[in-house]
Amino acid sequence: MEKTRKLTEASLLTAIFVVVTIISVGSGIGYGIYLDYIVPLFYFIIYLKCGSKYTVLSAMSGLMIVFAVLGNPGTAIWASQGIILGILCGILSEKKTSLMDDLLLGTLIGSIIMVFIDIYASKLIGYSFIQDFKETISYMAKYMTKNVPAFSNFPPEFIHSYFSTVFYVSITLIPLGTVVGVYIIGLFVGNRLNVLKGETKKKYEVIRHFRTFSRMTFCSRNLFYIMVIYTMTFSLMNKYGIKTNMAYIDTIMNCFFYSGLYFLIRDSVAGIQGYMLTKGKSMGQVRLFTILYLFILLSYFWLAAIIAILYFMSIDVKYGLREFYCEKMSTLLTN
């Protein structure tokens, strides 16, 4: 009976997906917010409601119908990216991992998915979003160097490095923004539909009361250290000019670097804030520290980032901040 119910629900939701996709793409709005956010959100909910088996069945049948009706391989390709990201968010949300682990791992895996979908799209329909965006950034660099006096005073190496950073940060924001947005909104929608249970319910409560739990949730220690080692290694490779000739691999490595760096700094600042509170500092002092740190981070990025990460690592090992706040958060969630 349960299997029949899930199959019926998956079939109904698949029909809705097909109809809405055809209308959205046919009206011209499908290549905007719909394929990038609504599709992954939709399949995140299907996963929570129907489970992995029926979600995969729904995805395969839905994509085949959309492709058969529209005859547009591009739509099927970009929709498949959204579906995979939605299912990924569903899988991560059910794991006994921290919220930050889910978001970081989702971003890292999402970067790989995005690149491979782009490769597939370039081979099938002759269009590569990454290459097109890279050409746009390159054109901007040449234009600003020629027409903006402030840029003409800098050496070519600096300009190339600056716009390369802009390119890779912008590319990184795509999987990061998609995963974080779909994950958070999906849990709120899932709660409204009463499909959350177990770990997904706990993570929903953490997000719902994030103002309270923001200083208590971190990436796991192992994942944190892995990203520290990776960012250090990647920085040294860049410093000594060690690069791969494969553009897509280079894109993935840079996405990993900037995603990891963001979560390392975020965890470090949150950990230091939490440590200050355990030592009796007031919220006003914590806020003042945060404002001053952000100012220093904008002025001396690498110095501020390294100091915060190393200091957080030292107090975490010395005082067991992760264990302390994990236990405290569990107590608050059960009350």
Where are these regions (language model features)?
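Short helix-perturbing small/polar motifs within transmembrane alpha-helices
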Residues: 8-14, 79-122
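Central hydrophobic cores of alpha-helical transmembrane segments
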Residues: 57-65, 102-111, 282-295, 307-309
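Interfacial aromatic-anchored transmembrane helix boundaries in multi-pass membrane proteins
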Residues: 22-32, 63-91
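Alpha-helical transmembrane segments and their cytosolic interface
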Residues: 3-6, 159-284, 288-290, 295, ...
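Alpha-helical transmembrane segments and their membrane-interface exit regions
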Residues: 40-45, 66-67, 83-95, 109-114, ...
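Hydrophobic alpha-helical transmembrane segments
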Residues: 7-12, 56-60, 76, 80, ...
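Hydrophobic transmembrane alpha-helices
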Residues: 1-58
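Membrane-interface interhelical loops and short interface/amphipathic helices
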Residues: 118-165
